[in-house]
Amino acid sequence: ISFPVMQTKDNQFYLNHTVSKEYNDRGSIFLDANANGQFQDDNSIIYGHSVEGGGMFTLLKNYCDEDFFKSHPVFYLLTPDVNYKCHVFTFAKTTEDSVFYTTSFGDY
């Protein structure tokens, strides 16, 4: 997956707009509006469509296959300031009302 990650104050905008802000049903990949933008939150949620033909997040479905999961344990998130090496430790299909969408956690 090699797309820019957009962000705006309205999570609905990039659901159907391109990086150049033109209307498009496929939209863009974007960071949750409540995130700080530097990927330093406890949980940074990135949204994107799974589209026909393998674009955007469609390839993430491959993580449902255990062999693929084991053979692709790392991905890189590149930002203008920092390049992150990320380790995949779990994969789950979920719905928009799932607990996985929690972005703020209390002190424990």
Where are the regions a protein language model picked out?
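Solvent-exposed, non-transmembrane regions of membrane-associated and secreted proteins
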Residues: I1-Y108
